[in-house]
Amino acid sequence: MADIIVAIDGFSGTGKSSTAKKVARALGYTYIDSGAMYRCVAHYFIKHQIDFEKEKEVAAALDKILISFQFNKMLNTSEILLNKKIMDYQIRLPEVDEIVSQIAAKPLIRKAMVDRQKKLGLEKKMVMDGRDIGTIVFPDAALKIFMTADLHIRSKRRQKELEEQGIQVNIEEIKKNLAKRDDLDANRLESPLIKANDAITLDSSYLTLEDQVKKIVDIAKKIIHEG
């Protein structure tokens, strides 16, 4: 048996985070939401009115940003903390959606986050989801999954997620933001969203969350036992 890293990449709204959380739980692995790290940066920049086009401001802000993870035993889930404060709906708001891809495309920010992510993966036994996990962060990961889904279905999922938090957003606005983010993610110069050559594609459009998790866990267990 071998300890491995499971890298799950894909577009926003494909169910990466929900799937990755449950895969980690099923394997007894640590779950790291890399996208939430960039969302924490975006939230901090909005709150403190940081101009992400100015490198000196960005560098100074990054020095003040502490991102950490903890496991909540009562809720049986992983939580992300920004400067020791648990982040939840704050980093999923439309205002964060609008700028997170632009922030993630900045080389200074990207390098800082990737360096932190690589340190988190030193112990292996981890599931990390994002957009460049299998290509940049952990190119040697034993299992790489690339998730896709229909844009309208992704928009409905995001709308439901926001409504459950009491936030009402028009689905067309969500669809517009997702399409814009898809384009920014796929075409940015720094760590673009592309499928790794050895990644397995998983279209989640018409799969239940349980189906997605089972497919990945079955593959992961086979790799772990063969290792």
What does each of the following model-derived ranges do?
Residues 88-165:
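ATP-dependent NMP and nucleoside kinases share a basic, alpha-helical "lid"
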Residues 61, 72, 117-124, 131, ...:
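Small-molecule kinase domains that catalyze NTP-dependent phosphoryl transfer to phosphate-bearing small molecules
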Residues 14:
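ATP-binding Walker
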Residues 17:
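Walker A/P-loop
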Residues 11:
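P-loop (Walker A) phosphate-binding loop of NTP-binding proteins
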Residues 26-92:
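N-terminal phosphate/diphosphate-binding loop that engages ATP/GTP or pyrophosphate donors
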Residues 6-8:
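Hydrophobic anchor at the beta1->P-loop junction of P-loop NTPases
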